[in-house]
Amino acid sequence: MTTRLFGTDGLRGQVNIYPMVPDMALRLGLAAGTFFRNGNKRHRVVIGKDTRLSGYVFEMALTSGLCAAGMDVFLVGPLPTPAVAFLTRNMRADLGVVISASHNPFHDNGIKFFDKDGFKLPDSQEDAITEMVLNQNHRWDYPEPERVGRAHKIQDAPGRYIVYLKNSFPSTLTLDGMKVVLDCANGANYRVAPLALEELGAEVIRIGTSPDGLNINHKCGSLYPELAAQRVRETGADIGLALDGDADRLIVVDEKGTVLDGDQIMAICAMDMMEKGRLPENRLVATVMSNMALEVFMKERGGSLLRTPVGDRHVVEAMRRTGAAMGGEQSGHLVFMEYGTTGDGLLAALQLLRIMREKNRPLSELAGLLTPFPQQLINVHVQRKIPFEQCPEIGRAVEQAEKELAGRGRVLLRYSGTESVARVMVEGEDDALVGRLAAGLAETLQQHLR
């Protein structure tokens, strides 16, 4: 069986520690270029990155490998992950590559691939690439010297993405008179997001738009929405938008400074789409982490919630399989299949702003559609990731917690696909009970997974 090199969101790790080393990036470029090369036509790949200092290292290594494999490389510089997915389709490329570790600190980085249609690669293709990369005896099928690829910088890539975003917003509407607090996490959207909102007429109050290579996600962005909330209260803004480092997720703050997560944003957007007949079979796709209240919300309105494993990749796969138009994660990955192929924080923000404009209602009123059940999420750092069912003590603790919830709540244990972390999630009707059970389960995991 092929060793899994890729997690739920590509390859990720600490810079200059295996596997996030330049040699790995070079071999990944060679392998991906070889795998996607087909026939004698010129092959093209789009490479984008976020604002991490190490992005230059992996950009150059990947470019070398891809060019050596016969791919022409289009370098678009710091741009959001969804922008690279869009540009891969828009530029008729064979492959898209993003260099980013998303919401992680600057000392981490990652590499993920998109196919020609802008979708993340399936396991089978990632495994084929992995097999070439890890086989030190693999004989590379290098092209003839005249078929070696060229590298080009694409200067107008940000402008193309802005036009794409604005085309998702009705031409009959503007954001004139709206005050928007925008936190770009010193990440990939630091240039594009403010410009797109300002071109639509909004007054933008900027946070996290001065990247220095080291400050990406540092006490800002979607993991620190209280920063945007404070600025909303100070300035009287209509809304706060907090993006993560690669801008594929969104957390929102209403005009009162209340933080809204992905579940609440999905409820608002799903309701709007159901009213307009734009949500096929009134089906919404979300992960096992989404609050039970979202499931109840959809059922009460004649709809349904289809749950998937964690990761926007799994959400998108389920959407494609079922024909769903919208899906997302509580963490803020939101996918609108009419417009894009992956989570896009700014595109999701524009959909929310459109609804606010069309209904002429403040965000706090719209958010009243969904009242989340009490939920507690605890991250437990682990030394090993053994299957939970192989530890009887963990099984007994889960069984006891479910017994106390008496069918009026959920317990979920899972490992992170990108970090050495086990996640404990408990939700139910009683806040105190939920907190106590979550803390007890976290302690059990700490004892048995060290």
UniProtKB/Swiss-Prot annotation:
Spans traversing the lipid bilayer: none
Binding-site residues for Mg(2+), renumbered to this chain: S102, D244, D246, D248
EC number: 5.4.2.10
Keyword tags: Isomerase, Magnesium, Metal-binding, Phosphoprotein
Listed GO MF terms: magnesium ion binding; phosphoglucosamine mutase activity; phosphomannomutase activity
Classification via NCBIfam families: glmM, PRK10887.1
Family of the protein in this entry: Belongs to the phosphohexose mutase family.
Function of the molecule: Catalyzes the conversion of glucosamine-6-phosphate to glucosamine-1-phosphate.
This protein's name: Phosphoglucosamine mutase
Originating species: Oleidesulfovibrio alaskensis (strain ATCC BAA-1058 / DSM 17464 / G20) (Desulfovibrio alaskensis)
